[in-house]
């Protein structure tokens, strides 16, 4: 590959008529020699509002050093983030999923608007990862994602705790099992420093999935935020993206159908977040890879759940790092025929070649169960179907002993109303709590229900009360929960016509989600019901009008699809 080939976009500045453009670039420090090299963007979601992202500006500088040491010119950019843990349970949560697509669009705009030849995207909070990957897939120029790393566990009275411990503490306080002072002690010790939330929650799930896809460096997803390994992998990402340029390696070479199958496989084995379904569908859509909810069920049936990680297990993500990390898990799964070892990754090597350099899981470790004695014989993420969710719904059943729940619905049109019912003991064992009109269009923004689900668990009703919604759940959620119900209420899905007292069935063995309401009664209720108008102001108004169903990834660019489904 020639130097000009490596400058496949920035060479636009070479001509005489681009002298004014170069004048601007010289003010940023570029010299004649720099104009002869590739321009590589380094864009992060740095912000001071959350531990997930507070360190990312410094990480951007490390990535720049890597780019420069590889002979290219680095340029640092910033984009937005919305911190789920801070927005949770507030009106701000409507902006969380919305931010995923804003991040994707802003990265594409900044990188394309400045004609960079390649880029490194650095993220820390939940929507940063899929947002970055949607942009990477859409642009299809050499690019790597670098994760800011997982937070260290907090410690209280010799016991590891995390943010979810505080959410559940509210339920325990309401139930009389904790004092306000107990909760304050949790609050003050749960988050000891920078990094993404520490269990197998959404941030760590998506960072892992991206590593498995082959779009971040091997081992990087499980390096803790404050570790020396993390600083090294961030700098290495800068060097690696220049190597991708030299190889002519693009995301479309890496993001294959087999790559997504492997990402789902590892997500199942580690007990990842329900949000993985939404985000992997969206990334696949951007990459023009055919992926559907049914693919998750197909893989779920053959892949056991091996990881004893929070929220349903006892270990945090840093514990996985200490026994070999994601590469050791992948190596174990590859050796047992679960992964495609021959596909290419961002290193220019295959999955199998990358993993050959890593050690096996530490002998005697207890974070990852053996295939002969898994935590669960099949995967913990299940796609449900039935007359309550004709287009599907997503359940996470890790740690759930109840395989079938049948009970009366208690229907709420907002999370706030449902929370009030829980706090005032209106929800009794056997109930099915339903929160609707909180889907992608109805929210708008499909907010997560961690505040609500954690209160139910904290009150000791996690296995006794089912929680259903057309919204989402945090990766920190566990219990009898079903989200992403589609079609959503705002689109006139059956959940819009469910009434308090209707009997609802959730069965993880038959993968059923149904309501005991006849077609005739349902049609009668439709005729009697007027759906609320779409939200129509600002960014949420735009989002509500263009976002797709959750069953298709809640993406925002479906209007230009041809019959093949390609963009």
Swiss-Prot record:
Organism superkingdom? Bacteria
Q: A Pfam family matched by this chain, by name?
A: ILVD_EDD_N
- Enzyme class, spelled out: lyase
Cofactor(s), by name: [2Fe-2S] cluster; Mg(2+)
> What reaction(s) does this enzyme catalyze?
(2R)-2,3-dihydroxy-3-methylbutanoate = 3-methyl-2-oxobutanoate + H2O; (2R,3R)-2,3-dihydroxy-3-methylpentanoate = (S)-3-methyl-2-oxopentanoate + H2O
Catalytic residues as annotated in Swiss-Prot or TrEMBL: 474
Keyword Ion transport listed: no
Q: Which UniProt keywords apply?
A: 2Fe-2S, Amino-acid biosynthesis, Branched-chain amino acid biosynthesis, Iron, Iron-sulfur, Lyase, Magnesium, Metal-binding
Q: Which GO terms describe its biological process?
A: isoleucine biosynthetic process; L-valine biosynthetic process
Q: In which pathway does it act?
A: Amino-acid biosynthesis; L-isoleucine biosynthesis; L-isoleucine from 2-oxobutanoate: step 3/4; Amino-acid biosynthesis; L-valine biosynthesis; L-valine from pyruvate: step 3/4
Could you tell me what the cofactor note in this record states?
Answer: Binds 1 [2Fe-2S] cluster per subunit. This cluster acts as a Lewis acid cofactor.
Which residues are annotated as modified residue N6-carboxylysine in the UniProt record?
127
- PANTHER family cross-referenced by the UniProt entry: DIHYDROXY-ACID DEHYDRATASE DAD (PTHR21000), DIHYDROXY-ACID DEHYDRATASE, MITOCHONDRIAL (PTHR21000:SF5)
Q: How does it assemble?
A: Homodimer.
The record describes the protein's role as: Functions in the biosynthesis of branched-chain amino acids. Catalyzes the dehydration of (2R,3R)-2,3-dihydroxy-3-methylpentanoate (2,3-dihydroxy-3-methylvalerate) into 2-oxo-3-methylpentanoate (2-oxo-3-methylvalerate) and of (2R)-2,3-dihydroxy-3-methylbutanoate (2,3-dihydroxyisovalerate) into 2-oxo-3-methylbutanoate (2-oxoisovalerate), the penultimate precursor to L-isoleucine and L-valine, respectively.
Q: What is this protein called?
A: Dihydroxy-acid dehydratase
Organism (species): Streptococcus pneumoniae (strain CGSP14)
């Amino acid at each position: 590959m020639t130097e000009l080939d490596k400058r496949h976009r920035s060479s636009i500045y070479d001509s005489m008529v681009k002298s004014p453009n170069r004048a601007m670039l010289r003010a940023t420090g570029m010299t004649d020699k720099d104009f002869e090299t590739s321009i590589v963007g380094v864009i992060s979601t740095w912000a001071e509002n959350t531990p997930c992202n507070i360190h990312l500006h410094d990480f951007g500088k490390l990535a720049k050093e890597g780019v420069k040491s590889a002979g290219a010119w680095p340029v640092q950019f910033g984009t937005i983030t919305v911190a789920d843990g801070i927005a949770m349970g507030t009106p701000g949560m409507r902006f969380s999923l919305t931010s995923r697509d804003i991040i994707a669009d802003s990265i594409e705009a900044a990188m394309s608007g400045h004609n960079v030849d390649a880029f490194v995207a650095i993220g820390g909070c939940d929507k940063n990862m899929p947002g970055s990957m949607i942009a990477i897939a859409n642009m299809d120029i050499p690019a790597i994602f670098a994760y800011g790393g997982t937070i260290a566990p907090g410690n209280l009275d010799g016991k590891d705790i995390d943010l979810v411990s505080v959410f559940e503490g509210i339920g325990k306080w309401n139930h009389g099992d904790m004092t306000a002072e107990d909760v304050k002690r949790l609050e003050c010790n749960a988050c000891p420093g920078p990094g993404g939330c520490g269990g197998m929650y959404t941030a760590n799930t998506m960072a892992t999935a991206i590593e498995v896809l082959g779009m971040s460096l091997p081992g990087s997803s499980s390096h803790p935020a404050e570790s020396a390994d993390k600083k090294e992998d961030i700098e290495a990402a800068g060097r690696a993206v220049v190597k991708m340029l030299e190889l002519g390696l693009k995301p479309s070479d890496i993001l294959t159908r087999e790559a997504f199958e492997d990402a789902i496989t590892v997500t199942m084995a580690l007990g990842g977040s329900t949000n993985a379904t939404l985000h992997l569908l969206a990334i696949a859509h951007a990459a023009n890879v055919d992926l559907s909810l049914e693919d998750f069920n197909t893989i779920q049936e053959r892949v056991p759940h091996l990881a004893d990680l929070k929220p349903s297990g006892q270990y945090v993500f840093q514990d996985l790092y200490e026994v070999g990390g994601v590469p050791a898990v992948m190596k174990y799964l590859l050796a047992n025929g679960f992964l495609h070892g021959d596909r290419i990754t961002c290193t220019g090597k295959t999955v199998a070649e990358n993993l050959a350099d890593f050690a096996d899981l530490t002998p005697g470790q207890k974070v990852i169960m053996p295939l002969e004695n898994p935590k669960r014989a099949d995967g913990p993420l299940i796609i449900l179907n039935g007359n309550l969710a004709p287009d599907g719904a997503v359940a996470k059943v890790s740690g759930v002993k109840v395989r079938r729940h049948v009970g009366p619905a208690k229907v709420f049109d907002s999370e706030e109303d449902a929370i009030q019912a829980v706090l005032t003991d209106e929800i009794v064992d056997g109930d099915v709590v339903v929160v609707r009109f909180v889907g992608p269009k109805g929210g708008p923004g499909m907010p997560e229900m961690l505040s609500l689900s954690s209160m139910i668990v904290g009150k000791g009703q996690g296995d006794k009360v089912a929680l259903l919604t057309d919204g989402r759940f945090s990766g920190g959620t566990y219990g009898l929960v079903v989200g992403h119900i589609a079609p959503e209420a705002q689109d006139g899905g059956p959940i819009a016509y469910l009434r308090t007292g209707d009997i609802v069935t959730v069965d993880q063995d038959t993968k059923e989600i149904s309501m005991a309401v006849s077609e005739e009664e349902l049609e009668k209720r439709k005729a009697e019901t007027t759906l609320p108008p779409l939200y129509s102001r600002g960014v949420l108004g735009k989002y509500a009008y263009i976002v797709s169903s959750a069953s298709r990834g809640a993406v925002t660019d479906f209007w230009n699809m041809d019959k093949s489904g390609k963009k």
